């Protein structure tokens, strides 16, 4: 269950100590995990991912807008180059997020696959959503 994992290392890498650690835990729960653990006390991360996607887009858009006078087309292309599954999953890999994920046995075996890349990218967005809910926009930025 949730108590089996120590998230302090991940919180340190994120630079955030969660007020409500359930947000972080839920951000790491893939839908497949709940198929094998139907009594798990939290839901999967898809709603947090939905929220986090919007927050990531806003943060990157705001940064580009405030720091580059380029036309809209350039800014849109740069944002697309920064906010995609390849980049977001790479950030998660660098932070060691994989070791904290709650995955089904089948998903746990698919290391290094395209599917894992999307799981990590989605986890990144869910973590951002969790930080946003727990600590607000200024902290998540």
Predicted regions and their residues:
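RNase III-family endoribonuclease catalytic core
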Residues: 2-141
């Amino acid at each position: 269950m949730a108590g089996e994992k120590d998230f302090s290392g991940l919180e340190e890498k994120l630079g955030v100590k969660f007020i409500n650690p359930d947000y972080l835990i839920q951000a790491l729960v893939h839908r497949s995990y709940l198929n094998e653990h139907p009594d798990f006390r939290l839901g999967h991360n898809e709603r947090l991912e939905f929220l986090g996607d919007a927050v990531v887009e806003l943060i990157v858009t705001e940064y580009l807008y405030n720091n580059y006078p380029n036309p809209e087309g350039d800014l849109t292309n740069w944002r697309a180059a920064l906010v995609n599954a390849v980049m977001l999953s790479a950030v998660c890999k660098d932070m060691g997020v994989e070791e904290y994920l709650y995955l089904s046995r089948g998903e746990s075996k698919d290391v290094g696959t395209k599917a894992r890349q999307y799981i990590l990218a989605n986890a990144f967005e869910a973590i951002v959503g969790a930080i946003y809910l727990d600590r607000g926009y200024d902290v998540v930025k």
